[in-house]
Structures are given as C-alpha cells and as structure tokens.
A protein has these predicted regions:
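Short, small-residue-biased leader/transition segments that mark boundaries at the very start
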Residues: 1-5
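Sec-dependent N-terminal signal peptides
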Residues: 9-15
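C-terminal motif of bacterial Sec signal peptides marking the signal peptidase cleavage site
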Residues: 19-22
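N-terminal secretory/targeting leader peptides
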Residues: 24-123, 141-143, 147-336
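A gly/proline- and charged-residue-enriched helix-loop-helix capping module
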Residues: 122-138
Length: 336
C-alpha cells in the first residue's frame, strides 16, 4: 500500500507541476510561475531538509517569485533509490540526498568512501570546492543523467560505543553496525572491528539488547534517533564526511533558459554555504546534548589516526582499482 500511495502522490505532483508551469499571462513572461517538486528521503529536522528549503527559498527570491519549488520530505515521494531513478527519468526534477546511495548508480562516487582522508571539515570542504575536483565529480553526475548544483555536508561520521577507544588496539573485536557497503565493511574489518550490516531501524534495539557494541553515523543522526542514550562513549573517528548533494535532472536543466540556469546555480551556491553553517551550529548543539547526558566524547590522537590510515591501505587500493584514476588522484592530491 505504501508504494502504491507514493506512486499516486508522485503522479499528482508531476501533473500539478506541469499545470503550474503554464500558469500566468501568455503576454507577460515576468508573471509566469513554475512549481517544481524537490524530494528528499530525510525527516524535516535535518540539514538535508534545511539545504532543500533554503534552495527553494533562494530560487523564489532570485526570480522575484517567478520560479517556484515545492519540497517533499520524509520519503513522501520515495526512498533514496526511488528518488534517484525518478530524477533520472525526469519525473522529479530535484533531489537532495547523501552521496552514499548514489554509488550503486555512479561508481566513481565511491571516492567519498576513502576513509580518514581529512583531518578537518575545512579541508574536506576545500577539496569539494576545488574547481578541478568539482568539475570531475560534476561530470560523473552528468554521465548518470544528473546535473550537480551543490554539495553540502552533515559533518563527519563518528562512532558511538559502549567500549572506550583510547588507542588503535581498542577497536579490536568491537561489534559495530555499518551500512550495507562493501568499502565500509572492509574499513572496519581492517582496523580490527567486527562490522555487522543491519537495518537502521534495528540499531537502537540492537544497542539496547547488546547484540552490537557500537554504530557509526553523523552527530545529528546519533542525537535525533537517541542512540547516545544506549552508549557510554562517542569516538570522533571522523572516518568519512557525510556529504549531501543537490542534483537536478540534466535534460531538464539544459532545457531551461540561460537566465534560469544562472538563478539555480546562484541559489544552490547560497544554499550550500547556508547548509554548512547550519550543520556546524547543529553539531555543536548535538555535542552539548550528548555531553549533558553523561555520555563521554573521546578524540583520537595523531598516532591512532596514523595507525588507522596505515591499516586502511587495502581499502584505498580496492577503491583505487574501481574508480577513475583521475578522480582518485584529484581527491588525494595534497593529502599526506
């Protein structure tokens, strides 16, 4: 029933968008109004949603209300995979989502699964914004049928656990829930942990019943799902950035007048910076919530991070073998 309902909603949204696209006086182009759907699979109180809403707001502002975007959150129009497919088909022009589910559609995006590349979020953002690298990644999206408008983030993914991690050896044997991603599994195995893929809906109970010791996610997810209530420690492994892409169907974008393309590009730029600022503020707030609960936050020293990188060499080699070497080298350029 859920899938049938979503298909009905999608059909209604597409029909509405088509009807609104023609609204306005035929003799007055400035009064023409558009209403295009933008979909996410994320809850409303997330950076993903903030990113989407800010983009829609700026589109309206920069076009003097002529261009309109309606945001649909909470998987209203489908889950991550559904949204990618319907965006590629052109039924939903815009999608905002994490890059992780996109790897199965665009293999070169596995570059973002390279572990422990960056020492800080600023370094990561500088890399994403590097014109040469951004163009390479944009081309990956174009080949997939999308146009990349912007890439924000939700900070780094960190580890929460009931077993403290003070040194590299403390990862050994920890039963940690991971996403169903071969590179993620390989990383945790490489550093001595015992990774266990599990549906996210089962994680809280798994921690509560001690079928797993640990899990990994951005701070926002750890707090919004109350996972910290079942954990004694949060370890700032910062092993992967949690990147959020804003994409549009490529044919749809190319068919727009040049001035509207420019409005979208500028709106996305503003929304990306805003989402990053909001993410930073929200992470600080989430950390305070965790600390107030009595859960301790642990940071890793340089030696431990160096040992993690050394142990992860096999993961680097595997990803390097499976993606465009130009993209791999551009991502790793300047990384010691």
């Amino acid at each position: 029933l859920g899938d049938v309902y979503k298909r009905q909603v999608l059909a209604a949204v597409v029909a509405l968008g088509a009807s609104l696209a023609g609204c306005g006086s035929s003799g007055e182009e400035t009064t023409q109004r558009y209403s295009w759907p933008l979909a996410t699979a994320s809850p409303e109180d997330t950076v993903t949603q903030i990113f989407a809403e800010k983009f829609a707001e700026e589109i309206s502002e920069l076009s003097d209300g002529r261009m309109k975007i309606q945001v649909y959150a909470n998987s209203t129009l489908g889950g991550d995979r559904d949204l990618l497919e319907t965006c590629a088909d052109g039924d939903i022009p815009f999608v905002v989502q994490n890059t992780a589910p996109q790897v199965s559609f665009m293999g070169d995006l596995a570059v973002f699964d390279l572990p422990c590349v960056f020492d800080s979020l600023d370094e990561c953002r500088e890399k994403i914004d590097n014109p040469e690298f951004y163009e390479l990644i944009s081309n990956v999206y174009t080949e997939g049928g999308y146009h990349l408008l912007g890439m924000a983030d939700q900070g780094f993914r960190v580890m929460s656990t009931n077993k403290p991690v003070y040194s590299f050896s403390d990862f050994k044997g920890q039963k940690i829930r991971t996403m169903e991603n071969s590179y993620h599994l390989a990383f945790w195995k490489a550093i001595g942990a015992n990774p266990t893929p599990m549906s996210f809906s089962e994680v809280y109970i798994g921690l509560q019943q001690h079928t797993i010791d640990a899990q990994e996610n951005p701070y926002e997810v750890i707090v919004s799902n109350n996972l910290y209530e079942q954990q004694d420690y949060v370890v700032e492994t910062n092993h992967l950035p949690h990147l959020i892409s804003l994409i549009v169907n490529d044919d749809f974008f190319r068919d727009l007048p040049e001035d509207e393309q420019e409005i979208m590009t500028e709106a996305a730029k503003i929304a990306t910076e805003y989402a990053r600022e909001q993410s930073d503020a929200r992470i600080a707030d989430k950390i305070a919530t965790i600390e107030e609960s009595g859960t301790k936050i642990l940071t890793l020293d340089d030696q431990t991070r160096a040992e993690i990188r050394k142990a992860s060499k096999s993961v680097y080699a595997s990803i390097e073998e499976n993606i465009d070497p130009v993209i791999y080298n551009a991502y790793m350029d300047g990384i010691e």
